[in-house]
Amino acid sequence: MLWPIVTNQHYKDALKQAEDGGSPNNISPIIRYGLSGGASVMWMGDLETDFMEKIEDAITPEASDILFAPHHGRKSGRVPKDWLDKIDPTIIVVGEAPSSDLTYYDGWDTITQNSAGDIVFECSSGKTHVFVSNSTYSVDFLTKDDGVGDRHGCYYIGTFYT
């Protein structure tokens, strides 16, 4: 767990704001976990860009293979460039929100949940197979691994290697 740092004044202010009926977005945790020898994943909850910029020096995000974009991938939750460079994700998952509200992270490989539907990451040592529920969704940045078929109620779209 990278965030919250409960002694951080910005966190305390966001907690007070939520307690007073304001938005709870900026009390979201930043959680990172990884499979030994396999993929690492980072979730950033519903953090908003302006808040992330305030706490940018309080934490150092680690490199992660999969980043679930904060605030469902909305422009208002775009990850600061310095953090994004440190995380250096293989894939950024842009969540479900109106497409006009989303940031698509130009220059990074993304899977857009609005189009892909449900997403399954099957993580194993050295590789991660990716499946989605939309049978017509595809990306050009994953490698097809022979012998991997559809499963988990989803369609196989490719593999990345860690």
What are these regions (language model features)?
Residues T49-K127:
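Cap/insert and terminal regions of metallo-dependent hydrolase folds
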Residues M1-A63, G117-K127, F131-T162:
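Core dinuclear metal-dependent hydrolase active-site scaffold
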